[in-house]
Amino acid sequence: GVYADGSHAAVAVARMAASEGAAALLVFPPNSMSMGGQLRPDMAIAHFKMIADATDLPLILFQYPASTGLGYPFETMLQIFAEVPSVVAIKDWCNDPMLHERHIKTFQSLPRRVNVLSTHSSWLMASLSMKPAGLLSGAGSVIADLQVELFNAMQRDDLAMARSVNDRIYPLAQAFYRAPFLDMHNRMKECLVLLGRLDQAIVRPPLQKLEEDEIVKLKQALVAAGLQN
């Protein structure tokens, strides 16, 4: 992931990732655009052009909800695709089903197709029913196998199987994405510890380690999902 407030810093991260063997770059919106950047499409285009000029790697645009102040307007994304051909996909977190479907229908039908990768992990089955090209989800660190099963079931229109898999995903989605939302990755780390995939769940301040009662609830969600006895 290329996460930086300034374009020069983003270029440095992109070059470092490329030198270390990255296959693609997920470009986060810079926080410096949060106070009205939607009104300056030239800023977003310039940001992507600088990164694209620094590396030959394919780029994935990370689309945030409009409510965050960091989401790109629809027309701005079309401009980015037209002017920066190394942008090959978006990680779609618009969190608006109507807009999400518009992204899928429009971007995946462009002369130069731009794939939509859903990260609507709290309502993934509904999202996958719209047939995005794939998904890119933090929860995949814990439930990648279930997400792949759900994706494949929706691709072949096997609704019964999709519902069955989604019933297993549901308790963990509810546990991961409840308020406060900022603890979602802390919760995933604790689940990885419970599953024996991590030795410990390290938290970077100002985030704080979860209370024991919440870790117990995460264990219960893992049991409900059939991932732990």
Role assignments for model-derived ranges:
Residues 1-71, 208:
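Active-site beta->alpha loop and helix N-cap motifs at the rims of alpha/beta catalytic domains
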Residues 12, 46, 75, 98, ...:
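Short, contiguous clusters of charged residues that form electrostatic/catalytic patches at enzyme active sites
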Residues 50, 54, 65-173, 180:
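Catalytic alpha/beta core domains of metabolic enzymes, predominantly
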Residues 139, 143-229:
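C-terminal alpha-helical cap/extension of soluble enzyme domains
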